[in-house]
Amino acid sequence: SIVSAAWSVAVFEIFAIIGTIFAGWATDKIFKSKAHHMCLVCMVMASLFMIIFVAFPQMPPVLSVLVLAMGGFFIYGPQALIGIAAANQATKEGSATANGVAGVFGYVGSFFSALGVGMLADAYGWNTVFYVIVAVGALGAIAFATMWKAPRDGYERAKQIKYEE
């Protein structure tokens, strides 16, 4: 029903807000301010919950909403953290530019995803949309995994460059 769908979206967004706050807290407290570590966790977990959602279409509605909500919990963390991670790597000399570039990619991605989701759903059905979400999540996880050993910021590297000049 329309009411059930509206509540599902509302629960998804509420969990997304809570998850975004948690991602910031976990970045500082668990991952010692290494935002790329939390982004990797978020990408893996969001993809996992989307896989569960698609793999078990006959699950009870309450469980279905809970699985989607947990996907929402993890889905916005990277969006919130990527600007901070970029700014930290660029140091104070380029932090605003780095954050701006990351933000532009986020907004362009949001625009095309909204358009793309509708087109995919119309042409191939909603399962395809979720498969694409999982694939994009996997690509994001791979990208963040390649950064695992990166330092929390670029300040040490910047000091070395200045001393070498």
Which residues does each PLM region occupy?
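C-terminal ends and interior cores of transmembrane alpha-helices
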Residues: V44-Q58
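Paired intracellular helix-loop junctions of major facilitator superfamily
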Residues: K32, A86-S95
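Cytoplasmic membrane-interface "Motif A"-like loop-to-helix N-cap segments
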Residues: K29-M43
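Hydrophobic core of transmembrane alpha-helices in multi-pass small-molecule transporters
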Residues: P61-G77
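A membrane-interface helix-boundary motif in multi-pass transporters
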Residues: K34-H37, M119-V136
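Helix-to-loop junctions at the C-terminal end of transmembrane segments
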Residues: T20-S33, A121-D122
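Multi-pass alpha-helical transporter architecture, strongest
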Residues: F53-P57, W126, V132-E165
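A late C-terminal transmembrane helix in Major Facilitator Superfamily
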Residues: K92-A123
